[in-house]
Structure formats: structure tokens, C-alpha cells
Regions:
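Internal transmembrane alpha-helix with an interfacial aromatic "cap," most often the third helix
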Residues: 1-38
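Membrane-interface helix caps and helix-loop-helix hairpins in membrane proteins
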Residues: 1-13, 70-77, 99-100, 121-126
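Alpha-helical transmembrane segments of multi-pass integral membrane proteins
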Residues: 14-27, 44-62
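Alpha-helical transmembrane segments and their membrane-interface exit regions
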Residues: 17-27, 114-117, 136-144
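Membrane-interface capping segments at transmembrane-helix boundaries
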Residues: 27-33, 143-158
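A loop-to-helix transmembrane entry motif
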Residues: 44-53, 72-86
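Membrane-interface transmembrane-helix boundary segments in multi-pass integral membrane proteins
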Residues: 76-92, 118-140
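Central hydrophobic cores of alpha-helical transmembrane segments
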Residues: 105-117
Length: 159
């Protein structure tokens, strides 16, 4: 709502609030660490992880729009350099979710998002190439996450 009416500052506050609430719920549910049934995994954990991933990406997009709206100078760094910095930060989040939670749902959202960035920014070689590298890195992490979870006997799942 806020974003559609160019209320970018308010939109950022709404998104940060939603992101904070989702993180609190994610931690409370202990996604990736507590054994759950297959039904709960597919109806709660995976959708929650995917939604948290999308809201994480959307929050970055909203902050980016807000900074553009207020003509932020970026501490002298070019917008393309900031895009690469944000890709690195997002990759670190994906790595954190893989190492601490083996959460492939969250990481697959990053794969999709980075591929979209690479495609949309194809004219900006630095951004596009960095996004493709990030896409491949996240895809590798997602696959690693699934393999490790299965190697552990899918230890989260309760029969």
C-alpha cells in the first residue's frame, strides 16, 4: 500500500516491522532445528522460510527505492558497486541460513531473486555478472543444504 503511493519511508518502516516479526516467528518455531512431521515441514516450515526469504528481498528493494527517492549519494560509491555490496550481504545471509538451519527454502528464494537481478541488469556487466555468480553460489548452498539434511537422516522429521 505505502509503496504504491510513493510513501517509501513509511514502506521501509512497514517492511522492517514485518521482517522483524517474521524473524521472531522463525526463531520461535525453531525452523531447521526442531524435529517436525512431514506435514508440518511442508505446511509450516517451508512456507515460512520462503515467505521470510521474499520479505528479506522485498525489504532490501524497499530500502533501495527509498534511498533512490531521497537522492542518497551512496558515500561516493557508484550504484553498481552498492548493488554488488548488497549481493554480498545477501549471500552472507544465505550462507548463515545454510550453516545454522540448512534452510534451502530461504536460499532458493535468493537463487530466484539473484537470477532476476542478473537478467534485469544485463546491460550493467558488473551487476549482472555478480548476480550470476551469487545465483550459482546460492544454488550450490541450497543443494548442499538438502544433501546435508538428507545425510543426517532428515533428522528433523518425526514419523
Amino acid at each position: 500500500f505505502c509503496w504504491h503511493y510513493n510513501l517509501f519511508g513509511l514502506s521501509v518502516l512497514v517492511m522492517l516491522t514485518l521482517l522483524g516479526l517474521l524473524i521472531a516467528g522463525y526463531l520461535k518455531l525453531n525452523v531447521g532445528r526442531t524435529p517436525v512431521s512431514a506435514a508440518e515441514k511442508w505446511s509450516v516450515d517451508i512456507p515460512f522460510s520462503v515467505y521470510l526469504g521474499w520479505i528479506s528481498v522485498a525489504t532490501v528493494a524497499n530500502v533501495t527505492d527509498y534511498l533512490y527517492f531521497i537522492n542518497w549519494a551512496g558515500f561516493g560509491l557508484a550504484p553498481q558497486a552498492w548493488a554488488v555490496v548488497m549481493l554480498v550481504v545477501a549471500c552472507l545471509l544465505g550462507l548463515l541460513m545454510t550453516v545454522t538451519r540448512r534452510d534451502s527454502g530461504y536460499v532458493f528464494v535468493l537463487v530466484w531473486s539473484f537470477a532476476g537481478i542478473a537478467q534485469k541488469q544485463s546491460a550493467a556487466a558488473l551487476v549482472a555478472n555478480s548476480a550470476w555468480v551469487a545465483t550459482l553460489f546460492m544454488l550450490g548452498l541450497a543443494i548442499y543444504s538438502m544433501v546435508e539434511r538428507n545425510r543426517a537422516g532428515n533428522g528433523r522429521e518425526v514419523k
